[in-house]
C-alpha cells in the first residue's frame, strides 16, 4: 500500500497515477469517508485531504486504525466513485463497509482495549 492517501485510492479505483482529472472528485469522496470516521470518534477534528501529499499517518498513528481505515476508505470511495454493475458485488461491498465500521467503532471505544 502506498503511504499517500490519494495514491492508494487511485490504485484501488484503477485510476492511473498520472491521470489527475478525477483527483477533485476522489478527494471529495475521501473527505466524506473521513468525516464519517470523525463522527465515529476516530479523530478529535475533521480530517481532509486536498492532494496526494496527505498520508495515512497524517490521519492517525494508531496501529489498530491504520489496519482498517485504509480498507474502509477504499471501499466507501469505490462504491461512490465507480460502483460495480453487479448488485451482488455492491451488496458484498456494503456488508464489508458495515463490518469495518463496527471494527472501527470497537477500536476507538475507550472501554475496549487490546490485552498485551
Task: Describe the residue ranges of each PLM region.
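Conserved short "hinge" loops at termini or chain/domain junctions
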Residues: 1-65, 102-116
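Short loop/turn elements at secondary-structure junctions
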Residues: 59-116
Amino acid at each position: 500500500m502506498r503511504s499517500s492517501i490519494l495514491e492508494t485510492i487511485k490504485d484501488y479505483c484503477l485510476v492511473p497515477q498520472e491521470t489527475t482529472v478525477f483527483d477533485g472528485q476522489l478527494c471529495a469522496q475521501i473527505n466524506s469517508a473521513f468525516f464519517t470516521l470523525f463522527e465515529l470518534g476516530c479523530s478529535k477534528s475533521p480530517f481532509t485531504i486536498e492532494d496526494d501529499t496527505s498520508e495515512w499517518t497524517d490521519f492517525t498513528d494508531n496501529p489498530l486504525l491504520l489496519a482498517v481505515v485504509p480498507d474502509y476508505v477504499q471501499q466507501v470511495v469505490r462504491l461512490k466513485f465507480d460502483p460495480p454493475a453487479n448488485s451482488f458485488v455492491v451488496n458484498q461491498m456494503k456488508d464489508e463497509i458495515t463490518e469495518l465500521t463496527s471494527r472501527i467503532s470497537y477500536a476507538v471505544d475507550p472501554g475496549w482495549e487490546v490485552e498485551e
